[in-house]
Amino acid sequence: EVKLVESGGGLVQPGGSLRLSCATSGFTFSDFYMEWVRQPPGKRLEWIAASRNKAFDYTTEYSASVKGRFIVSRDTSQSILYLQMNALRAEDTAIYYCARDYYGSRYWYFDVWGAGTTVTVSS
């Protein structure tokens, strides 16, 4: 069974940091692009970060809204995806999801999702 389980969310003050984790199982982690997507309260899903697969040297890509503040990385030995979030802002408040990108296309083929972890940025 393919599983993605996020953790690490919580309440943090503006300017603070959090690291989210996404523990994966049931598939060959290195073969797949992995993505972070978020949903702010009352808003649509927003793609924020990608980690390409081993064939593409696990290179990364970010949305303009988080570039320079967030860092996506992998622990390939434990099949864990991370999202280091720095300089957090109120507008980063959201449910954060990791997703497997089956075809390596950020836009259409997210075939497995975790349940999400909630991040609240507030003083």
Curated annotation (Swiss-Prot):
- Other facts noted in the record for this chain: This chain was isolated from a myeloma protein that binds phosphorylcholine.
Coiled coil ranges:
none
Q: Do you know which Gene3D superfamilies this protein is assigned to?
A: Immunoglobulins
Instruction: Recite the UniProt keywords alphabetically.
Output: Adaptive immunity, Hybridoma, Immunity, Immunoglobulin
Q: Name one GO molecular function term.
A: antigen binding
One GO CC annotation, please?
Answer: extracellular region
Looking at the record's lineage, which domain of life comes first? Eukaryota
Q: Which InterPro entries match?
A: Ig-like_dom, Ig-like_dom_sf, Ig-like_fold, Ig_sub, Ig_V-set, IgHV
SMART domains the UniProt entry points to: IG, IGv
User: What protein is this chain from?
Assistant: Ig heavy chain V region HPCG8
Q: Which residues form the Ig-like domain?
A: 1-114
Biological process terms from the Gene Ontology for this record are: immunoglobulin mediated immune response
